[in-house]
C-alpha cells in the first residue's frame, strides 16, 4: 500500500506543477497576442487553475469511475469553502469587495441548484445536464470578458505592431512549456485516479470518500497557495473572490465537461442513516457552506471570524462522517 501512497503524492505534485506551468505559459501567450491583464485573469488564469480538477474528473468519468468524478468536483467546492476560505476568514477577517462576489455567487447558486435538482429528481447526471452546465459556463465567461473589456485601459494592451525575433522565441518557448504543463497534468491525473482507486480498495473505503477528501484536497492546493499568498499580502478579499470563482468553475466547467463526455449515475456506494450520503450529506454541505460564506459577504460587505470557525467545524464534521459513520 505504501507504493500507492507515494504514487498518489507524486500524482498530486505533477498536477500542481503542471497547472502552474500551464497558467504561466498561457498568460505569456495571451500577452503576446495583445490580451489585457483583466481578460487574462478572468479567463486564462481562472481556467488554468481549474485544470487539475478537470483532468481528474473527466479522466475518471471516461474510465467509468463516476464516483471519483463527482467526489472530486463536489469535494473541491467543500474543501475550498469550509477549509481554505474558512481558514482565511478565521485568521484575518476583512471587508469584502462585493463586486468580486456578486456575479460568480449568483451564477454558482443557479448552476448548483440545477445540478442538485438533477441529482435529486433523476439520480443521474445526464449529457443534457452537462450541456446546460457548459452553457452556463459560456454565458459566465462571455459576461466576465465583456465586463473586463469595459475596464481596459490602453496601457494594459500589448502593441502587436512591433514584434521582434526575441518575442517569437519567447512565444515558441511558452507554447512548448504549455504542452509540457498539459502532459504533467495528464500524468498526474492518471496517477491520482489509479492509486486513489487502489487505496480505496486497500483501506476498504468507498471511492467516493477518497475523492471527496484526499483527491479534492489535493486538487484544491492551488487555491490554498493563492489564499496563503493573499493573506500574507493583505488581499483577503481577492483570495475569497478567487475561491468563489473556482467553486463556480468546478460546477459549470469541471462537472459540465465530465458529464457531457461521459454521463454517470449519482454515487450510491456510501449510506448514512440508511440513505444515500450524496443526497443527505455531500450536496447539502456544499450548498450550506457556500451560503454561510456568501450571505454575510453580500449583505454586509464583510466576513467574520465566527464564520470561519463555524465553517471549519462543518468541514471537520463532514470528514468525520465520511470516514467513521
What is the predicted role of each segment?
Residues 1-325:
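Hydrophobic alpha-helical segments, chiefly the membrane-spanning helices
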Amino acid at each position: 500500500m505504501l507504493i500507492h501512497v507515494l504514487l498518489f503524492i507524486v500524482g498530486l505534485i505533477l498536477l500542481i506543477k503542471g497547472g502552474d506551468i500551464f497558467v504561466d505559459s498561457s498568460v505569456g501567450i495571451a500577452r503576446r497576442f495583445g490580451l489585457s491583464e483583466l481578460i487574462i485573469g478572468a479567463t486564462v488564469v481562472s481556467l488554468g487553475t481549474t485544470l487539475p480538477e478537470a483532468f481528474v474528473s473527466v479522466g475518471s468519468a471516461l474510465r467509468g469511475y463516476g464516483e471519483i468524478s463527482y467526489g472530486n468536483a463536489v469535494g473541491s467546492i467543500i474543501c475550498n469553502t469550509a477549509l481554505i476560505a474558512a481558514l482565511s476568514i478565521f485568521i484575518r477577517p476583512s471587508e469584502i469587495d462585493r463586486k468580486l462576489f456578486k456575479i460568480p455567487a449568483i451564477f454558482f447558486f443557479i448552476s448548483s441548484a440545477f445540478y442538485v435538482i438533477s441529482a435529486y429528481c433523476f439520480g443521474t447526471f445526464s449529457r443534457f445536464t452537462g450541456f446546460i452546465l457548459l452553457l452556463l459556463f459560456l454565458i459566465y465567461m462571455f459576461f466576465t470578458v465583456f465586463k473586463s473589456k469595459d475596464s481596459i485601459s490602453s496601457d494594459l494592451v500589448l502593441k502587436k505592431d512591433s514584434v521582434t525575433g526575441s518575442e517569437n522565441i519567447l512565444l515558441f518557448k511558452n507554447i512548448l512549456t504549455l504542452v509540457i504543463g498539459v502532459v504533467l497534468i495528464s500524468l498526474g491525473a492518471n496517477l491520482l485516479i489509479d492509486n486513489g482507486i487502489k487505496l480505496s480498495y486497500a483501506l476498504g473505503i468507498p471511492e467516493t470518500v477518497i475523492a471527496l477528501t484526499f483527491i479534492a484536497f489535493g486538487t484544491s492546493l492551488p487555491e490554498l497557495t493563492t489564499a496563503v499568498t493573499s493573506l500574507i499580502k493583505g488581499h483577503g478579499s481577492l483570495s475569497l473572490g478567487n475561491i468563489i470563482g473556482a467553486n463556480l468553475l468546478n460546477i459549470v466547467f469541471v462537472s459540465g465537461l465530465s458529464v457531457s463526455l461521459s454521463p454517470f449515475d449519482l454515487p450510491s456506494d456510501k449510506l448514512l442513516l440508511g440513505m444515500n450520503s450524496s443526497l443527505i450529506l455531500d450536496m447539502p454541505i456544499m450548498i450550506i457552506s457556500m451560503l454561510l460564506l456568501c450571505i454575510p459577504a453580500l449583505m454586509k460587505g464583510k466576513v467574520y471570524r465566527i464564520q470561519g470557525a463555524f465553517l471549519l467545524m462543518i468541514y471537520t464534521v463532514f470528514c468525520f462522517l465520511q470516514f467513521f459513520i
